[in-house]
Amino acid sequence: MPERFKWEETERPQSLNSRVKEAFHSPASLKPRLELAISRTEAQAQRLDQTAQRLSERDKSLFAKIIEAYSKHDAQRANVLASELAEIRKTQKTVMHARLALEQIVLRLKTVTELGDMVGALAPIVGVLRTIKGSIVGVLPDAGKELEQIGTMLNGIIMDAGQTTGLTLNFDTANEDARSILTEAATVAEQKMKDQFPELPSVMPVSANKAEGKT
């Protein structure tokens, strides 16, 4: 975070009504709220990192078991394990996508140095958080709930900044920016998955005799 926000550099005499309003909507009051949002977002990114690490370890374990089953010509076991690993990798991709999107969110939040930047900068972030929350709530319910609360906090900051500056939100631009963040994160996640994890072996046919022997 910048040590000093640009909107803090100038102070002007204010009426009593203005000072009362500032207690709720002032730029100075928005700064700690923004910093808290950054801190909470970073905490969720770390939680996703931990989840990704656990999934990666499970991935390696399953892959090794698949190779072992193939070496023993146990097609049925190999195929069952491969199906499980495929589901693990779907979850890994979801978590990685969310993690990369949160990384972009933190970077954007840390670049907000002027009050006038807030409405335009924060609006797409709220949309991204809403999408991420929907994708990971089934994997990490607590993280999904926390992201929803962060989004609510940022919405409050947007409303207060809008009241202070008189700026209005361009929803089309905000939605386009949100899609851009999510698309970029998805592209990077796809490439990282290809780079980090070996391709699953082809499904082996199970002979009728072997299948009967397993039942």
Q: What is the meaning of each model-derived region?
A:
Residues M1-Q50, V119-T215:
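Long C-terminal interaction segments enriched in charged/acidic composition
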Residues H73:
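Residue-level signature of catalytic and energy-coupling elements of molecular machines
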Residues L109-A121:
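A cross-kingdom feature marking charged/low-complexity
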